[in-house]
């Protein structure tokens, strides 16, 4: 059975981002978390992380819909093999 709560390091690994980026997500309120223990270590509930990921997929899909890819974007993304 998967753990209910994840450390910030676990979250960082899952999202493939740095520990400081994970901390910023928590401190900004974008990723709900709780402080536990006498030293106030952060924990993120696994269901909250899954909800965050789903929100990011939805926000990205909305962004892609409202910002269609133009030819200049495609040209900029293609490597110069010449």
Q: Where are the predicted features?
A:
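Basic Lys/Arg-rich amphipathic helical interaction modules
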Residues: 1-24, 46-82
